Amino acid sequence: DVQVWKVEGRSVLEVQIPRSASRPHFCEDENGKWQAYLRREDRIHRASPVQVKVWQYEMRMDRSEFRYDQFIGKLFNAWRDGRQLRFQQVARMARLRYEDAEDLLCLLIVWNIIEWERGARGLVYQLADASALDELETRGPEQFRCKNYS
């Protein structure tokens, strides 16, 4: 769908592109490095490694295993208390290697338990659905594995 708008004497081309079923897509940047990008509020941002993994997780059913321990519980409580956490804070609080923290965040985002937001401090992660988090803690991850999240 294409439309041309006239704004302050200029022509603005608006193109509606349907959501891709095979995300993520990469393009080569000026340094020859392949990057994924996303558009938010009329701005283009380079996708974080977590966002790229989220897109990859949405496209496949075999996902990382979820494990729960006292440190993950501490992380969940911080989100319940309304905290917005940067990636490094999530990894440190949950005592996870960065790759494992990426996997955890991806699962929780795909399962619609947490969401990310781009703020003044960069990307932050926050609780999206407290009841889903409660369900994950009480009933386990099997409740979420069979659902279609894409």
Give the residues covered by each predicted segment:
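Conserved N-terminal catalytic/coupling substructures associated with nucleotide/phosphate chemistry
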Residues: 1-150
